[in-house]
Every structure is written in structure tokens, then in C-alpha cells.
């Protein structure tokens, strides 16, 4: 569905992505339930999201998604989100800690998303957040054409085999590559009007 670039501030995240990919991000909005805000980039039927804590909104009484409460450092690719038709069924096939469905809304968009109680997704955040959109509206369809497409998403983790097994019943996409490595890392490559570019 989309990939998430987390940032300490939205302006920092937008500047980093625009510099890396050589294109401008489009509008986004606020998520009052999580006290976050975002800007988006269309990737065909997918999109890229830059997300950060929104200091203008009151802090929630629960952990923010994508473990944003603990985010530090420069903007980076921290999470990916998998679209599903049946969130309840997908959660039944997912590891413990993937989350519980939370009904959310931003402007005309309505969706349910599995949000972990502590804000931290399984496999050190390498397991996807699960989302089910309500109705026919989807951000990717409303975003301007950017000329950017996701070429691949490489997920590096010490427990690569276990992660691959956990994903096997949820998603099959040749762009997703799961690699064994000493520490977790997410790397995305994009085909852009300026050639192949990457984010991590």
C-alpha cells in the first residue's frame, strides 16, 4: 500500500525525500488520533508517506504508530504498510504484536489499521503495518503523477527466514526482497525521472 519515511519534523522529512528522489511531494494532512501529520508522493497504485509528530495537536494517551514517540535522528525509511481486503483475517495469520484494528479517518479517507499496543511492529518494525481501506477512496488515486515507481523494497533482518515465513501467507510481491543481515534495515529503490534512486 505505502512506505513510511519517519522524521523528527515534517519539514525535515520532506526535504530529505525531495532531495533524494528529485521530485516534489504533494499534500497530506493530520491524524488527530495519533497526533501526527504527513506529506505524500504518488507511486502509481502505491504511495510514499513522510510522517512526523504534529506538535500542534494534543499528544495521545497511547503510543503513536510506527514507534514515532521514540524516533530520533535523521529522516529514514522505518516502515511499510500492506493493504488487505480482510484485516481481521490477515491479523489471524500474523505474528503476535501486529496490533488490533483501529478505525481512522483523514478528510474523506477512512480506513482500519492494525496498531500495536506499544507502537512497535514485530521483527523490530520490519513486519508491515496492515491496513484495510473503507470505500473506494485511496490516496494514490488522488495524488498527481510523479513519474516515480517503487523498484524494490529490501528488508534486512537477523531472522530473515522467520520473517519470510510470517509474510508468506499475507503478501506475494516480487519487489519485496528479504535478506539475512546482522541488524535490521529497510532499503527502497525507485525508478524516477532522474534514474534509479534509493532511500533507507
What are these regions (language model features)?
Residues 5-25, 43-200:
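Glyoxalase I/VOC metalloenzyme domain signal
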Residues 29-32, 55:
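Short, acidic/turn-prone active-site loops that include or flank metal/cofactor-
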Residues 1-2:
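Extreme N-terminal starter segment of soluble prokaryotic enzymes
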Residues 33-45:
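N-terminal low-complexity or amphipathic/hydrophobic leaders
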Residues 31-34, 181:
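A short beta-turn/loop motif at secondary-structure boundaries
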Residues 23-29, 36-38:
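Short secondary-structure capping/turn segments at boundaries of alpha-helices and beta-strands
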Amino acid at each position: 500500500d505505502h512506505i513510511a519515511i519517519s522524521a523528527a519534523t515534517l519539514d525535515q522529512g520532506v526535504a530529505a525525500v525531495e532531495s533524494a528522489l528529485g521530485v516534489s511531494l504533494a499534500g497530506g494532512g493530520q491524524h488527530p488520533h495519533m497526533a501526527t501529520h504527513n506529506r505524500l508522493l504518488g507511486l502509481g497504485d502505491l504511495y510514499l508517506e513522510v510522517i512526523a509528530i504534529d506538535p500542534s495537536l494534543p499528544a495521545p494517551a497511547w503510543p503513536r504508530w510506527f514507534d514515532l514517540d521514540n524516533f530520533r535522528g535523521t529522516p529514514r525509511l522505518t516502515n511499510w504498510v500492506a493493504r488487505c481486503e480482510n484485516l481481521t483475517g490477515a491479523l489471524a495469520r500474523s505474528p503476535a504484536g501486529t496490533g488490533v484494528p483501529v478505525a481512522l479517518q483523514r478528510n474523506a479517507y477512512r480506513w482500519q489499521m492494525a496498531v500495536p499496543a506499544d507502537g512497535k511492529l514485530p521483527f523490530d518494525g520490519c513486519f508491515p503495518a496492515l491496513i484495510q481501506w473503507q470505500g473506494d477512496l485511496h490516496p494514490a488515486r488522488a495524488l498527481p503523477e510523479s513519474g516515480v515507481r517503487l523498484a524494490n523494497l529490501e528488508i534486512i533482518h537477523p531472522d530473515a527466514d522467520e520473517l519470510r515465513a510470517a509474510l508468506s501467507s499475507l503478501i506475494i510481491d516480487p519487489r519485496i526482497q528479504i535478506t539475512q543481515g546482522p541488524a535490521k534495515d529497510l532499503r527502497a529503490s525507485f525508478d524516477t525521472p532522474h534514474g534509479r534512486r534509493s532511500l533507507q
